[in-house]
Amino acid sequence: MLFKDGLHGTSLHNYSFYCWLYIHIYPSLMSKNSIHKFCIAPMMQYTDMHDRYLLRLISKKVFLYTEMIATGSLIYGKCYEQLDFNREEHPVGVQLGGSDIKDLVECSKKCEQQGYDEINLNVGCPSDRVQKGKFGACLMLEPMLVSECLSNMQNAVKIPVSIKCRLGVDNHESYEFLHNFISTVKDSGTKIFVIHARNGILNGLSPRQNRNVPPLKYDYVYRLKDDFPELEIIINGGNQKFRRF
């Protein structure tokens, strides 16, 4: 899927780089009505309600996500308006950033009350600011905490709770590290995993560079699907051409 018109000072076709594409390896695990066949990733300063509404006009089937919303900002009212969305946007998920279980539970309830179809926990953003808040990609070093966060979020709401993460962080870039992380986190009951097929570099690269510099390792994600056939695995990163998958 390519978008050709401009928005927010950038070309919409650039969105294809960030799109999430479901891996069609085990079709028996995916119903005809799966809402994750094709998704637009959460993008700060881009995927607000106006952008999402435009994307919904372009496609009635794509799954949409909000920008990442930090739990602290939502709880203290600094960005509550970011929860607003047009009912025409469905299906649409909200992405939360945080690691405090109590805060995540409170925000999850707010999101469900607002009418979202899914809540996604950000464990993939490598920015310095996010690290200072102890959330994003740095949480891959604390799989037990991530699992506990997701478990409590799921117990607090009835809508699905998913996670977006990287292959690893810094020098933790082996498949074994990723496998162990997924193995621990899935015990929370989480079934939907969005995997950015790159390592996250916590120091030395900007968020923009982290979307391009670390090499793509799609084979890691394919191996995950083999090792965890019961999970819904969504691949992210460099998705410019469907035929690559």
Give the residues covered by each predicted segment.
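Short, low-complexity intrinsically disordered segments enriched in A/P/G/S/L with frequent Arg
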Residues: D5, T10-S11
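Flavin-dependent oxidoreductase catalytic cores
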Residues: Y26-F245
